[in-house]
A protein has these predicted regions:
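Short, well-formed alpha-helical segments that are part of the catalytic scaffolds
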Residues: 25-38
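A conserved acidic beta->alpha catalytic loop
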Residues: 35, 48-57, 74, 105
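Conserved donor nucleotide-binding strand/loop of the catalytic core
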Residues: 60-80, 88-92, 123
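Conserved donor NDP-sugar-binding/catalytic core segment of glycosyltransferases
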Residues: 110-147
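A recurrent flexible, glycine/aromatic-enriched loop bordering the glycosyltransferase active site
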Residues: 167, 174-194
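A short, conserved alpha-helix in the catalytic core of glycosyltransferases
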Residues: 186-187, 191-194, 198-204, 208-235
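Non-catalytic, C-terminal membrane-associated alpha-helical segments of glycosyltransferases
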Residues: 255-260, 273-328
Length: 328
């Protein structure tokens, strides 16, 4: 705590504003908000997506001039939360940089102050090193390169797909967490720093994506705009995720599969560019092979068709509430 208090008392020329999206994880949220407000940030925006666990009441009890709380009337999902959160941060604080993360994540003590001390010349995006509370690397937040932009990585990824190790073809290795900084193409929204001017240039995160892939799509779009995105291993975040879903053959509830499939195609369209027509049939085949894991096969296949249609049309065909009703 003394180190945190020291960093909070220092004055920085660069204005950093944090954005947190929360939903029914009050105890985690308390840790995240406390960690941010102990740092030299110019502002904090919390978007609470309709929590019913006391989060809203706790947020209302806080008194800090740097805090702005947004209480949407309906659940906007992580993507929608970051969209309105980024917008509010830009309007309320006119920052130089934004940093975002979910309510079950938080910056390690001194992380945000350390970011403000970095040489950020020529950089528009940065990813922190994200760890589980036990100190191991958080796999879901491991930054990556886009294999479609790097021939060697594309070959490595294709070979890895044949052996079930495709992630290793384009995600950073453990050794990169011991280096100074690494240029990357994409990263998650846990400990993601974006220059405010870049946000104004490429636009806000796409709220209609709701969940899954919105962070990868956004950071890939940042890179496609010509901006530089780097991994900063010295800036540490902690992600206290409750579950690791790797290896699960079936996505439940079913509506989550819709977002995973549709947004996956949106992501591949951004990542693959001219290669997308070759990637599309491969992804569709993987969906068809997965049908054996779903008891309601007709409903699952209807979901696949809806996800394909929406991805190709580039617009949602129904509301989140309707999706939940169709695919419980």
């Amino acid at each position: 705590m003394p180190d945190q208090m020291l960093s909070s008392s220092r004055s920085y020329a660069t204005k950093l504003v944090a954005v947190i999206v929360s939903f029914n994880r009050c105890e985690h949220l308390k840790q995240g908000v406390s960690a941010v407000l102990d740092e030299p940030v110019s502002g904090l925006v919390v978007v609470d997506n309709g929590s019913s666990d006391g989060s809203r009441e706790w947020l209302a009890s806080l008194e800090d001039s740097r805090l702005r709380v947004i209480l949407p009337e309906r659940n906007l999902g992580g993507a929608g939360g970051f969209e309105v959160g980024f917008k509010k941060a830009l309007e309320a604080f006119d920052p130089d940089w934004l940093v975002c993360f979910d309510d079950d994540a938080r910056p390690a003590p001194g992380a945000l102050a350390a970011f403000l001390e970095q040489d950020l010349e020529g950089i528009d995006g940065a990813a922190a090193a994200v760890y589980y509370p036990d100190g191991s690397i958080c796999e879901m937040n491991r930054p990556s390169w886009n294999p479609f932009w790097h021939v060697r990585l594309l070959c490595k990824t294709v070979l890895g797909t044949l052996t079930g190790r495709s992630r290793g073809g384009f995600h950073l290795a453990d050794r990169h967490y011991r280096e100074a900084r690494v240029d990357i193409d994409s990263s998650s929204f846990v400990g993601c720093f974006v220059r405010a001017e870049a946000v104004r240039s490429i636009g806000l995160p796409r709220g209609e994506l709701f969940i899954y892939g919105d962070d990868i799509i956004y950071t890939l779009s940042l890179r496609k705009s010509g901006s530089r995105h780097v991994f900063l291993p010295s800036i540490r975040f902690i992600h206290d995720c409750s579950a690791d879903l790797r290896g699960n053959a079936r996505i439940a509830p079913l509506w989550k599969a819709f977002y995973a499939y549709r947004n996956g195609l949106v992501m591949y369209r951004v990542a693959a560019g001219g290669w997308f027509p070759f990637v599309l049939p491969v992804k569709l085949l993987s969906w068809l092979f997965a049908v054996r894991h779903y008891p309601e096969k007709r409903r699952y296949l209807h979901l696949c068709w809806s996800a394909l249609r929406d991805a190709l049309r580039k617009r949602p065909s129904c509301s989140h509430e309707e999706l939940v009703r169709r695919y419980p």
